[in-house]
Structures are given as C-alpha cells and as structure tokens.
UniProtKB/Swiss-Prot annotation:
GO terms for molecular function: DNA-binding transcription repressor activity, RNA polymerase II-specific; protein dimerization activity; RNA polymerase II transcription regulatory region sequence-specific DNA binding. Efficient DNA binding requires dimerization with another bHLH protein. Binds DNA as a heterodimer with MAX. Interacts with SMC3. Interacts with RNF17. One of its GO terms (cellular component) is cytosol. Residues 57-70, 207-228 have a biased composition (Polar residues). Residues 43-56 have a biased composition (Basic residues). This is Max-interacting protein 1. It comes from Mus musculus (Mouse).
Amino acid sequence: MERVRMINVQRLLEAAEFLERRERECEHGYASSFPSMPSPRLQHSKPPRRLSRAQKHSSGSSNTSTANRSTHNELEKNRRAHLRLCLERLKVLIPLGPDCTRHTTLGLLNKAKAHIKKLEEAERKSQHQLENLEREQRFLKRRLEQLQGPQEMERIRMDSIGSTISSDRSDSEREEIEVDVESTEFSHGEADSVSTTSISDLDDHSSLQSVGSDEGYSSASVKLSFAS
C-alpha cells in the first residue's frame, strides 16, 4: 500500500516537472528534446481530431451508401421494365378473350399457367397418336413384304417366260431374214442368166442377118452373071 502511494507521488512530481518545462519552453520559444508524458492540454486537443476522422468516415460511408442506393434503384428500374415487357409478350401469347379488357398480374399468370397445362395435355395426346401411327406403319410394311413374296416369284417366272419367247421370236425372224436374202440372191442369178440369154439371142440374130445378107449378095451376083 505504501509502495503504491509512493508511485502515485512520483507520477505527480513528474507531471509537475513536465508542466513547468512546457511553460518554460513556451516562454523561450523552443521545444525540449526530453521525453516526457503528454500534457493535459494536448490530451484535451486530441478528441477533435478523432471527431474529424469520424466525420470523414461518416461522409465516406454516406457517399458509398448513396452510390449503392442509386445502383439498386437503377437495377430495380431495369427489372421492372423487363417484367413489364414479359407481361406484354404474355398477353400476346395467351388467348385472353374479348371480355378481358383489363388484366392484373396475378390473373394473367394464372391464365398462363392454365394455358401451359392445356398445351402439355395436347402435346401428350399428339405424341400418343404419333406412336400409334408409327406402329401401324410398321405392321403394314411387314404385311406388304409378306404379300409381295409370292407375287415377286410369279413376276420373276413371267419375266423368264417372256424372255424365252422373245429369244425364240428373234431366232425365227433371223431365219426369215436369211431366207429373204437367199431368195434375193437367186433372183439376181436368174437376171444374169436371162441377160446372158438375151445377149446370145441377139448375137444369133445378128449372125443370121449377116448370113442372109451374104446369101442375097451371092444371089445378086449370080443373077448378074446370068444376065451378062
């Protein structure tokens, strides 16, 4: 206890010395380089600085909050504009009827939900019908293949018969053509023989004429001899 009192007294003495030193420094106009405890007046002058820093912090935070608020307002404005545009498009897509002149957002969304359910039900029915048609198409295709089996064999047989007949016909036509060619060649031979015969006949006739003329000449010469 006594020791604590001595420490307090010592601190009071140091404080008194510091105050005296500060007063002398102020009077003489120079500062002391001796480290000492801060004066009560200096301690009293620090809170205004803290207040100024708090003011700066508060002003900076207020500027930040103002910027954040303006950004939030801009985002909210864009969101509402986008929502309004979506609602206008929804009015065009959903059949509302002529009696609905004014629509609330809730009523429009309920009608959109009902319309979507109706479209989904129609899509399910269409899908089921499409599957039935595909099954029927596969069945008819198999049936057609089964029916085309015997017909295909008959068609192949008829094609083979037709090709055989056509080949026989072509052979007979070829034989007829050969016969015609031979007859044509024979007629050409007869013509040559006829022509040679006629030529020989002409030669015989000319020889007969020459003989007759010779006989006439000889008879004429005989007559002349008798006359002389």
